[in-house]
């Protein structure tokens, strides 16, 4: 299976149904002036408002402990949701890479 790219704005959710583990890499994530929540495999992380996260030069590194690379087992779900509205998530670019490449 080839890699999959999720890009857009608003709440985002991905359920791994590949039959194998996947690596989820957040290249870009921008949150507006309200909090958002990232959830995966029983973990919940608050995503600070007004910040940009991701694997790029000058990405925010010290504002909060938001992971930008996550491993998901088959059947597990990853999501980012705005605290007050889906518009809290201004933009994202996420790549999902299957374990087998």
Q: Where on the chain are the PLM-derived regions?
A:
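Beta-rich globular "head" domains
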Residues: 1-44, 93-98
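Surface-exposed loop/edge segments in extracytoplasmic proteins
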Residues: 2, 46-57
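Extracellular/periplasmic carbohydrate-active domains that bind, remodel
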Residues: 54, 58, 91-94
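Beta-sandwich interaction modules
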Residues: 57-75
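Noncatalytic modules at the cell exterior or secretory-pathway interfaces
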Residues: 71-85
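Exposed low-complexity, polar/acidic, P/S/T/G-rich flexible segments that act as propeptides
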Residues: 85-101
